[in-house]
Amino acid sequence: MKPSHILPLAALIGSIFGNPVFAADAAASETAPAQTELKQVTVKGHRNAPAAVERVNLGRIQQEMIRDNKDLVRYSTDVGLSDSGRHQKGFAIRGVEGNRVGVSIDGVSLPDSEENSLYARYGNFNSSRLSIDPELVRNIDIVKGADSFNTGSGALGGGVNYQTLQGRDLLLPERQFGVMMKNGYSSRNREWTNTVGFGIDNGSVDAALLYSQRRGHETESAGNRGYAVEGAGSGANIRGSARGIPDPSQHKYHSFLAKIGYQINENHRIGASLNGQQGHNYTNEESYNLMTSAWREADDVNRRRNANLFYEWTPQSGWLSLVKADIDYQRTKVAAINYKGLFPTNYTTWETEYGKKEVGEIYNRSMDTRFKRITLRLDSQPLQLGGQHRLSFKTFASQRDFENLNRDDYYFSGRVSRTTSTIQHPVKTTNYGFSLSDQIQWNNVFSSRAGIRYDHTKMTPQQLNADCHACDKTPPAPNTYSGWSGFAGLAAQLNQAWRVGYDITSGYRVPNASEVYFTYNHGSGNWLPNPNLKAERSNTHTLSLQGRGEKGMLDANLYQSNYRNFLSEEQKLTASGEPGCTQMDYYYGLCSDPYTEKLDWQMQNIDKARIRGIELTGRLNLDKVVSFVPEGWKLFGSVGYAKSKLSGDNSLLSTQPLKVIAGIDYESPSEKWGVFSRLTYLGAKKAKDAQYTVYENNGWGTPLQKKVQDYPWLNKSAYVFDMYGFYKPVKNLTLRAGVYNLFNRKYTTWDSLRGLYSYSTTNAVDRDGKGLERYRAPGRNYAVSLEWKF
């Protein structure tokens, strides 16, 4: 589908979900008797949310059987994943990805990925971004656009914010105490999920206790599972980057949640929570590409603990509605244990014995963080000053400690040599600041929102915690970052159905420890630190139109995000000697000064970027529009399209291609069963939108030249059809099932291709493009789950 098709498609969706429907709702509401009673809703811990927030609630998590981040973004437009083979580095929103998209759990941000491209191409570190098992989650807010007012550093292009379950979420509606048991299976990675939880909600005590376990294998590629290579290999099941099927892997993860809140009396409430996840993914990297006689097996490990204590006071006051104090603690570990070696050679036959593996090295590389924070929040009662104001003030102080520690074993002639090292100095980061927001209702038509936040961040390198072979031994000087962020918005409620609005939000990201301080000194090239880095900045403008009525809903957003001070890994070429003079020519006296080149890398603020786009989402209750259609039938449609521009020669590769989703759903009025369908169109990435820079020479001894070229691996467009549903034989038992990629289309997503490395021992294909089949999306696959509450 060409971009020019966007306007007719938008007009079509607008005509389906548009004015006549909601105008009828508004007219009906004006003539109908005033018998409708709205239920009172109490909101705690509210977000200052812009219009472009996609909330995935517990019902949708269960209905769509969301098991991981790929499932989460499956039916979301303009949201992708930062995918890098063995590792997922978070999300891609509004043209940026990875550390530029914030991820938080109950308001506590997860740490950045600290790996740079120097080490990424070798695969010895675990560069994954931590997450949380959806089994522990009740709401997920996908914020599309800058959002540093709410989440601080990192929400440059948006954020994904998880809220953990409460006791009520585990109970039947009429129960105060109950048990929930859930089992599920997914064929795409042969994964079993087993969950058990206990919940209490009796008015005074709200408590939840839950444990979940996942066990599975590699994700299939177009119906192909991963198998270990037999002998020298044949067909698609071979070793090296041309391998055509996934690398075999096994994973096992444990997740838990313990949460309790106690209402001491009408005005005072206390609570505590603890949640965490730990596990590993063991991969036999048959696609490892060092040399044909080399092998590697990798065990990627992650561990996370989040704890919280809080106190709430709701005073009997004419101006103060809430005082809340929080203490948060987080500890994380992302590690990779790599087993490497050679296949031995039979010196009688001079054949490689692929059935044996000789261990040469075991690398245990770990990135650890510890985080502490204290927060105080004050919310006002509605205050009258030209309109109704609701003020919220927050102040906070935090400290995050980061360190890298590597424990490596080297095997030689039956002996083991053990070393402990690090690649950079530990860093302590302190942050303090405050924020103030105001939600204003001016009259029955106009409302506005505004907020401002100040952050002061100090990064202090510490003494080395182990030997560092290729870095400066003296801790660098501390770095300080200060700045303001905020939001402002104005909305008009045109009638009971339609609302229009404009929002501007800002974001920032403080460079992480690796970007500022990492050094690597080597004769062929250095990685230089840059203590003069600035924080990345962004702002997002959003024009929104929202319609709500008994016949359906429509959300339309036009947006533009601007980025500046973009951090980029820049290369500086240093040359000496006579061009064309090789070492061999010098040896034979044909020239006197051999030519040498050295590439130095350094993080620099150089780029600006802009992304513009449109998002449309609509739902239509067919029985409210067409009289002969039974109750329960619904139409769904969603479109996302974006166009980006990056200063310089490169493209913003993380910009998502066109995505269109349409569906027909039926849910019985008794809510006993339902069937849902989704047809997704995934647009192709165009070469002109995928430009990148390489340095190449034309032969030995010739100078390196900068070249801008098309990204070599572009996805084609594809249609994918899914069906899923549920059935409740009794009120406390729910069976869910789904079939995905029903017509078994063979396709590849842009997210899976843009993470490939051109020159690497891992997550790569060969120079002829062989091995791309390994990155195809799963073929026809299914998932089932059974949930029992009692």
Model-based region annotation:
Residues 263, 267-277, 302-467, 482-483, ...:
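Face-selective signature of the C-terminal outer-membrane beta-barrel domain
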Residues 187-216, 227-284, 303-306, 378, ...:
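Transmembrane beta-barrel wall of Gram-negative outer-membrane proteins
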Residues 27-170, 289:
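Acidic, small-polar-rich N-terminal luminal/periplasmic segments of exported/outer-membrane proteins
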Residues 441-444, 448, 457, 559-562, ...:
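Gram-negative outer-membrane beta-barrel transporters
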Residues 289-291, 295-318, 425-429, 474-485, ...:
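Outer-membrane beta-barrel signature, preferentially recognizing the C-terminal barrel domain
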Residues 151-152, 167-177, 204, 267, ...:
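Short loop/turn motifs that connect adjacent beta-strands in outer-membrane beta-barrel proteins
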Residues 222, 508, 559-565, 569-571, ...:
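C-terminal beta-signal and adjacent terminal beta-strands/loops
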Residues 121-123, 135-144, 148-231, 251-254:
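Outer-membrane beta-barrel translocator/receptor signature
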